[in-house]
């Protein structure tokens, strides 16, 4: 698993355990412990109109669940939904992202060893396979990925009135108020933003801070980048890479060299982009027109918290 994650995303063994394998083990342990109680019938109050009868909730599986997982945390975000779907009594079709082929092969090997294909099956492939699967009538669809594909998933599901869970990306700001502990805020922002090279759906997309603290916040962020990744992050063996050339080019094109105050370096050969901070950014800049999903952190300011 570690070697596959290293090849796909450049993750270190520590990061792989902290953000993927360890969390999967935790979920397995939790569901093994709690599934028996979750599966029990639970007595509930009976409405007066049904007086003299008894009412209860009886948990039951949906049936066949389609899990479509992303490439950024390919092991965690494939296996965790699988664990929960199985615990709820469902059969599952797994469709991992085509962008993480090495991890996909490991997952398929594990599934083939542990499950009958009539119970859990893995479908590998790209857009054609996604389309083919979405044309089928599943009882539940669990999708993690972009808003664009999420709309397609919901549209296809609506044809069969299939319930869905959509965990989608977006431009989520980290708002820093002027009373904040800037040293602590910077440490947490740098960790959350540049973990997995910014390829995290819950990472702060950009900073929106009080204009009075912007300069000091940027200084603290620069200190934390050096502390966490060293003076030359691209030479840090624990610093990962962008998933593929397409996304490397997309992220690289969002960087305005004239607004870079930290980082900006890149290595096309290894698909790495150094932790980057951009200042004097406006909401009209290219970097603010889409989810960044990479190690680029724009800093914007507001005059009052009400404005933010």
Where are these regions (language model features)?
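ALDH superfamily catalytic-core signature
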Residues: 148-283, 304-306
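Residue-level signal for inorganic ion chemistry
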Residues: 28, 89, 120, 141, ...
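Residue-level recognition of oxygen-bearing side chains
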Residues: 23, 99, 128, 181, ...
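Glycosyltransferase donor-binding loop in the core domain
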Residues: 57, 243-246, 297-300
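N-terminal Rossmann-like NAD(P)+-binding subdomain of aldehyde/semialdehyde dehydrogenases
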Residues: 1-56
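Conserved glycine-rich beta-strand-loop-beta hairpin in the small C-terminal domain of fold type I
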Residues: 270-274, 290-296
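Rossmann-like NAD(P) dinucleotide-binding subdomain of oxidoreductase/dehydrogenase enzymes
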Residues: 47-184, 302
């Amino acid at each position: 698993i570690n070697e596959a994650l290293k090849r796909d995303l450049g993750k270190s063994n520590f990061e792989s355990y902290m953000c993927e394998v360890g969390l999967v083990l935790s979920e397995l342990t939790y569901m093994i412990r709690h599934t028996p109680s979750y599966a029990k019938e639970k007595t509930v109050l009976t409405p007066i109109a049904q007086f003299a009868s008894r009412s209860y909730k009886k948990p039951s599986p949906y049936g066949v669940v389609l899990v479509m997982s992303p490439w950024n945390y390919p092991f965690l975000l494939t296996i965790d939904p699988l664990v929960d779907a199985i615990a709820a009594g469902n059969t599952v079709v797994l469709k991992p992202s085509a962008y993480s082929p090495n991890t996909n092969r490991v997952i398929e090997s594990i599934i083939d060893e542990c499950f009958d294909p009539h119970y859990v099956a893995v479908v590998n492939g790209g857009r054609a396979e996604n389309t083919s699967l979405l044309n089928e009538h599943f009882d539940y669809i669990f999708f993690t990925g972009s808003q664009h594909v999420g709309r397609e998933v919901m549209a296809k599901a609506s044809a069969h009135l299939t319930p869905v869970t959509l965990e989608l990306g977006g431009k989520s700001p980290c708002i820093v108020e002027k009373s904040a502990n800037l040293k602590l805020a910077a440490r947490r922002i740098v960790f959350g933003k540049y973990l997995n090279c910014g390829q995290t759906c819950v990472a702060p997309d950009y900073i929106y801070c009080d204009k009075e603290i912007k300069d000091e916040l940027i200084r603290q962020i620069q200190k934390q980048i050096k502390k966490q990744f060293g003076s030359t992050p691209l030479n840090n063996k624990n610093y990962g890479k962008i998933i593929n050339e397409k996304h490397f080019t997309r992220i690289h094109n969002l960087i305005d060299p004239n607004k870079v105050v930290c980082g900006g370096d890149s290595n096309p050969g290894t698909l790495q982009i150094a932790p980057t901070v951009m200042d004097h950014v406006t909401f009209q800049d290219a970097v603010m027109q889409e989810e960044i999903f990479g190690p680029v952190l724009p800093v914007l300011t507001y005059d009052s918290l009400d404005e933010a």
